[in-house]
Amino acid sequence: MDTEFLRTLDRQILLGVFVAFVAVGAGAAYFLTSSKKRRVCLDPENFKEFKLVKRHQLSHNVAKFVFELPTSTSVLGLPIGQHISCRGKDGQGEDVIKPYTPTTLDSDVGRFELVIKMYPQGRMSHHFREMRVGDHLAVKGPKGRFKYQPGQFRAFGMLAGGSGITPMFQVARAILENPTDKTKVHLIYANVTYDDILLKEELEGLTTNYPEQFKIFYVLNQPPEVWDGGVGFVSKEMIQTHCPAPASDIQILRCGPPPMNKAMAANLEALGYSPEMQFQF
């Protein structure tokens, strides 16, 4: 056999092996890099501490807390619509644990944010009131029963009261920021006064950026003199007007104070929404 032919064949074999080796190495490197980029920080069994890096007072009793994750590419690892358990100290120095829903998604790498309404007698509210930049918060999770896949429903109706807006905002963001998810979102958000409305700027941003997919109707118990939203409590008529009608491909989400949740459950039942069409956070 021609010696030159054998040498050429050997070179081709070696080149093929080299290319295959490089491809495997590149694939492994990509996998490792991707895994590193998507480092999940939550532990469902054990509390982990995260450093407070920013605190922005939104009103006299509401603040946004920004917590740093271990690396700039870390993610919290929180499924859409689920929450975390936060541990702190009350005014007597006793441990207290309470659930909260971050307003950030896993697309917000390197950090997570909590918008907290602090009540005068709230035990965990005391802990957040006392928190300063540089302090750490103990967090465990994820927690919750809500599960969602893009396009699972044609539309969501959302009934939120007060700080119950946080899981709604998280779900709405996840839907609207996913270009392949065409689910429509109809939100009714109830508060006592105009100043009680949480995430107002962010919600208005969603209506501006997604006008055909996201609709919001505000309801105030004590509205200002000039007001074009709802007045009083969320009624059956408001739900009929601003939420999708009962159907197998819609779901109504509820999150608010216990009296509101109870009243909304009764309103929804009277309007023909089956238990399968509803979910309460």
From Swiss-Prot:
Its cofactor is FAD. GO terms for cellular component: endoplasmic reticulum; mitochondrial outer membrane; plant-type cell wall; plastid. The keyword Protein biosynthesis does not apply. A motif (AKR2A-binding sequence (ABS) required for mitochondrion outer membrane targeting) lies at residues 34-40. The modification Phosphothreonine is found at residue 166. Its EC number is 1.6.2.2. FAD binds at residues 129-144, 155-187. Monomer. Interacts with AKR2A. This is NADH--cytochrome b5 reductase 1. The gene is CBR1.
